[in-house]
């Protein structure tokens, strides 16, 4: 998994902002590794242009990790050693492309390039089983979330299991109320997402 964190790098004192030739390097890793390569954003979403470049570079999957989850610019704001860096990082607290928008955009690019073999993952601001169902309806092959589990883990291992069961029940209810018997049915136009 290769993670992309340009904003975080730009607002931290030790950040590396020399990203020249990055797509070529990713393409080289994809060609030489012999294993699936996943590229993950870290909370600001993947644009159409970035999705296109990554798919053309040969990645196997993209985690769009859109805005709405952990804001690494805010993390950097809290650890910044100077007021200037705190202000700089804080200025980008709301930066990014929301997960749903990024997921739909990456899906259009994947379809345009005729690359159904490239998997799309959704993370960033996912909190409920209903969110999971919506991401699946928008084309996510995998949905990731942390916040509900981290909060439950502060309580107990049993609370984590309960959270997992609750999220599963919420997703199933969303599917039931949508008339979708499985994930593929949930993805049909008109079920959760309007036909275009």
What are these regions (language model features)?
Residues 2-4, 66, 147, 190:
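Residues that line or immediately flank small-molecule/substrate-binding pockets and catalytic motifs
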Residues 19-157:
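Glycine-rich phosphate/ribose-binding loops and adjacent secondary-structure elements
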Residues 9, 49, 84, 88, ...:
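Short, well-ordered helical secondary-structure segments
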Residues 149-196:
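C-terminal extensions of enzymes
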Residues 11, 124, 175:
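Generic anion/oxyanion-binding catalytic loop in active/binding sites
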Residues 1-13:
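Active-site beta->alpha loop and helix N-cap motifs at the rims of alpha/beta catalytic domains
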């Amino acid at each position: 998994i290769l993670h992309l964190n340009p904003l975080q790098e730009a607002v931290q004192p030790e950040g590396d902002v020399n990203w020249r030739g990055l797509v070529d390097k990713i393409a080289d890793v994809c060609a030489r590794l012999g294993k699936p390569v996943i590229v993950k954003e870290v909370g600001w979403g993947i644009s159409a242009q970035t999705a296109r470049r990554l798919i053309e570079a040969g990645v196997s999957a993209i985690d769009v990790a859109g805005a709405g989850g952990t804001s690494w610019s805010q993390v950097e704001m809290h650890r910044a050693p100077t007021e200037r860096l705190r202000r700089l990082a804080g200025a980008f607290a709301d930066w990014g492309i929301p997960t749903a928008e990024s997921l739909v955009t990456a899906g259009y690019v994947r379809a345009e390039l005729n690359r159904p073999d490239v998997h799309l993952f959704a993370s960033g601001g996912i909190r409920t089983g209903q969110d999971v169902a919506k991401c699946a309806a928008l084309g996510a092959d995998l949905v990731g979330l942390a916040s509900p589990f981290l909060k439950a883990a502060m309580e107990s291992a049993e609370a984590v299991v309960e959270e997992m069961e609750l999220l599963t029940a919420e997703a199933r209810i969303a599917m039931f109320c949508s008339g979708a018997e499985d994930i593929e049915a949930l993805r049909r136009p008109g079920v959760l997402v309007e036909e275009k």
